[in-house]
Amino acid sequence: MVGPESGAPYTVPWSRCDVPGLVRLDIEPHSTPSARKIARAVEVLHDGKVVAYPTDTVYALGCAIESRRGTERIYRAKRMDEHKKLALICPDLSSASMYAHFSRTAFRVARRVFPGPYTLVLPATREVPRLLIDHSHRRRQVGIRVPDHPIALALARALGRPLLTSSAIPPGEERALADPEDVELHFGRHVDLVIHGGPTPGEPSTVLEIIDDEVAILRAGLGPTEGILDT
C-alpha cells in the first residue's frame, strides 16, 4: 500500500493481533517516539483500559491512576496478592512530588537516580488513591518510578497523570518479561494494547525505601547502589 501523494509505503500505526480485541502498537524506542502512536495508546488509557509497554528494566502492565477497573484487571492478570501494591510511573520529579513526600534525603537520592531503573518507596500524599495504600503497614507509602525510557515517559507525559504500573511477571513465575512477543503470549487476553518497543534489559528496578534520612535497599536490581547510602 502506498501513500496517495509521496508514493512511499504507508503503514498503519497499529494493528489487530490474533487475540480478539487486542491491539498491537509498534513504536521505535527513539528519544522522541511518534506522537501519533503515543496518542493512540493514551486514548486506550483514558478509557480506563490496560496497556503493556516497555520500560528501562522490563515490560510492564499499566493503567491510568484513577482506573479501578484497570487496576483490578492487572491484579487478576498476574494473580497478585492484594497486599502487593502497584507503583506510579511519573514523567519527572515535579509530578512525582504531588504523590509522594520527598525529604531532603529523598530529594537528593531522586535527583541522583531519576530517570533510571529505580523505584523509591516514599510517604504517600493524599493524592494517592486508597486502593494503592497497604493498610497493613503503619505508614502510608507509595512506590515512585521515573524510568529512563522514552516510551514510558512519553506515555506518562501525554496522559497528564501517573501510570499505575506493575512488572509483567506471569503467574507462578519470578522473572518479568523482557520481550513484547512474550507479553502477548502470556498477557494478550488480559490487556487491551501491547506496545512493541523492542527488547528490554530483563532485570527489575532497584527498590529503595527512604524514611526521613534513612535509606534502605529493599531489592537489588538493575540500578547500582554504590554510593547511594552515603547521602
Q: What would you call each of these model-derived segments?
A:
Residues 13-231:
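Active-site-adjacent structural elements in enzyme catalytic cores
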Residues 1-19:
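N-terminal amphipathic/basic-hydrophobic helices that include classical n-h-c signal peptides
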